A protein has these predicted regions:
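Short catalytic/ligand-binding loop motif for oxyanion handling, primarily in non-cytosolic enzymes
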Residues: 38-39, 46-49, 101-104, 119
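Active-site-proximal beta-strand elements of phosphoester/diester hydrolases
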Residues: 37-43, 110-112
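Conserved beta-sheet core of the metallophosphoesterase superfamily
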Residues: 77-139
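Active-site-proximal segments of metal-dependent phosphoesterases and phosphodiesterases across multiple
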Residues: 44-87
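Generic secondary-structure microfeatures
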Residues: 25, 32, 41-48, 98
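Short, surface-exposed beta-edge/turn micro-motifs
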Residues: 35-37, 90-91
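Short, well-ordered beta-strand micro-motif
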Residues: 29, 39-41, 124-128
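Active-site neighborhood of divalent metal-dependent phosphoester bond hydrolases
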Residues: 1-29, 34-36, 60, 64-70, ...
Length: 140
C-alpha cells in the first residue's frame, strides 16, 4: 500500500531512508489534561501500556522486544476480534494501520486510519484542549 516509491530507489538511497526510519520512535506518549495518551502505528498486542513500553527498551536480541516491535507495526488482533477492553495506563491510545470507514473506538483505543492511501478521507484527532477526544475527517 504505497511502498512503490521506496522500491524505486537504488540500494544506497534505500539504506539512507531505512536509517532515518530506524531513528523514529516506535511509540509516542503525550501527557494531556485528561491523562496519558499513547500513539502507535498498529497496536500493542495487549492491554498493558507500561509493560509494552518497558519491553521496548530491552536489548534488540530480546525475543519479547522483537514481538513488541512486530505488534507495534503490524498487529490487528484487537480490531479483528472487536475486543473493546481498555489499555491500562492510558486515557486513550490512537492507532492506524487498519483502514476503517470512520474513526472507531474499541474501549480507549481509537482507530484513525480512514484509508487516505486509497483515496478516502484522512482523519485527525484532537488530544488536548477544547475539542479533545474529537476526530475530524476530510476528503483526501
Amino acid at each position: 500500500n504505497g511502498g512503490g516509491w521506496f522500491l524505486a530507489f537504488d540500494d544506497s538511497r534505500q539504506q539512507l531512508v531505512a536509517s532515518v526510519l530506524d531513528s523514529l520512535p516506535v511509540c509516542i506518549e503525550v501527557d494531556t489534561d485528561y491523562g496519558l495518551v499513547g500513539i502507535v502505528h498498529a497496536d500493542i498486542g495487549g492491554n498493558d501500556w507500561a509493560g509494552f513500553v518497558s519491553d521496548l527498551v530491552g536489548p534488540i536480541s530480546n525475543n519479547r522486544r522483537k514481538a513488541m516491535l512486530e505488534d507495534a507495526l503490524w498487529c490487528r488482533d484487537r480490531i479483528q476480534g472487536e475486543r473493546s477492553g481498555n489499555v491500562d495506563g492510558l486515557h486513550a491510545m490512537y492507532v492506524g494501520h487498519t483502514p476503517v470507514k470512520q474513526a472507531t473506538a474499541l474501549g480507549n483505543v481509537i482507530y484513525v486510519d480512514t484509508g487516505a492511501v486509497f483515496g478516502r478521507s484522512i482523519t485527525l484527532a484532537c488530544i488536548q484542549g477544547e475539542g479533545s477526544g474529537n476526530t475530524f475527517s476530510r476528503a483526501a
